[in-house]
């Protein structure tokens, strides 16, 4: 019965995870849909790139009141939303904003959000089962020392190690998906240099405050196997290889997205920026 209940819970989680409404997730971040009069260029970017990606529906656009530079997507291809922070809109030029939006649209098109949600549910289930195994092991310790119970060490070791292995696989899957989204975004915009430039700005902007708090060893690289995203330098290097027109596959080569000469992306009327980073339920900092 316990195993059946566990499988039922996992099945429910896997079925429910991809169906959380995109608007509900955006409300957690206090995202607001901007007026098209004030963000017409941004709406044009989302619409043009969505059409190029052949999405069944154009994702809804939300602006997040945050100073940090961030963008993310949520939902399914037929019910998706893209959130961009005010900090990102103010720090990047219009080409870079288009590249970042294309990256998020690529995640939507490739159903990365659903894949990662399912992987997250499976990982959390393994963590839960591992905790149960630890609790059972502690309860059986007296009986083990008394010699009345034999502990299945192999099964117990697998149970203990499974959450770590699942997390490593989840991180690897995330890195692969990020590389694919970068390349897809370059094809959608026809402008890989813009995404490379945006990634460089994002990398320079994040982490400096915390690095300055740690005077020694602050430049020690985080182990690549434990990263959810590939190293920015590697992502930029891959994009730089696409800048030469001859490197584009002919069937995927697209003209650049038509943009006005004046890069005007604004979110007037949304109120003051939230200056203080906060921790939100899905686990994202902004």
Q: Predicted regions span which residues?
A:
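Peri-catalytic and regulatory segments of divalent metal-dependent proteins
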Residues: 13-117
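Post-HEXXH active-site segment of zinc metalloproteases
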Residues: 111-142, 195-208
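Cytosolic-facing loops and C-terminal tails of multi-pass membrane proteins
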Residues: 141-174, 184-286
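Alpha-helical membrane-inserting segments
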Residues: 12, 16, 20, 126, ...
């Amino acid at each position: 019965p316990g195993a059946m209940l566990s499988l039922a819970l996992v099945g429910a989680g896997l079925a429910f995870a991809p169906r959380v409404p995109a608007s509900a997730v955006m409300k957690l971040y206090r995202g607001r849909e901007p007026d098209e009069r004030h963000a017409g260029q941004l709406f044009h970017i989302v619409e043009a790139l969505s059409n190029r990606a052949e999405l069944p529906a154009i994702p809804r656009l939300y602006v997040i009141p945050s100073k940090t530079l961030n963008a993310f997507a949520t939902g399914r291809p037929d019910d998706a939303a893209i959130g961009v922070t005010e900090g990102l809109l103010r720090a990047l030029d219009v080409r870079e904003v288009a590249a970042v939006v294309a990256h998020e649209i690529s995640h939507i098109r490739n159903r990365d959000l659903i894949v990662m949600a399912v992987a997250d549910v499976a990982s959390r289930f393994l963590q839960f089962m591992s905790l149960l195994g630890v609790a059972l092991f502690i309860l059986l310790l007296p009986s083990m020392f008394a010699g009345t119970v034999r502990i299945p060490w192999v099964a117990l070791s697998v149970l203990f190690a499974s959450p770590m292995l699942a997390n490593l696989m989840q991180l690897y899957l995330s890195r692969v998906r990020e590389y694919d989204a970068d390349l897809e975004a370059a094809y959608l915009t026809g402008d890989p240099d813009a995404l490379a430039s945006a990634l460089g700005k994002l990398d320079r902007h994040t982490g400096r405050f915390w690095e300055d708090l740690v005077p020694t060893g602050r430049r020690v690289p985080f182990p690549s196997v434990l990263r959810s995203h590939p190293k920015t330098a590697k992502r930029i290097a891959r994009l730089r290889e696409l800048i030469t027109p001859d490197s584009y596959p002919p069937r995927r080569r697209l003209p650049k997205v038509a943009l006005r000469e004046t890069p005007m992306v604004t979110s007037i009327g949304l109120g003051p920026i939230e200056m203080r980073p906060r921790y939100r339920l899905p686990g994202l900092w902004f």
